[in-house]
């Protein structure tokens, strides 16, 4: 595995550094007893930024490590690892999840039964 950052990892790193600064600002807001709704809005903004960083990392993983694992015959292990990594990430796996504009499909068992023609 390369130790040089990909463009996507660099983008995720920049997002995280921005989020860290934003969190520092929210802490200052709380310390100065800012209005709760204002704090909540800022927390939502940071949460969105973290979710975007996570999507960037997912795309990076799919383009690098995951595709290499599939090409090396380790596809099922890579799939299992990826499922484990995203199972607690509603922004990636929830019913309204979108990855680059594509809606995440339901597993085949979740499809409604079709009536015979």
Swiss-Prot record:
GO molecular function, one term: metal ion binding
Organism ancestry: Bacteria, Bacillati, Actinomycetota, Actinomycetes, Mycobacteriales
GO biological process, one term: negative regulation of DNA-templated transcription
Localization: Cytoplasm
Binding of Cu cation, residues: 36, 61, 65
Keyword line: Copper, Cytoplasm, DNA-binding, Metal-binding, Repressor, Transcription, Transcription regulation
Descriptive protein name: Copper-sensing transcriptional repressor CsoR
Subunit structure: Homodimer.
Domain notes: This protein has an antiparallel four-helix bundle architecture that represents a novel DNA-binding fold.
Annotated family: Belongs to the CsoR family.
UniProt entry tagged with the keyword Transcription regulation: yes
UniProt KW Transferase keyword: no
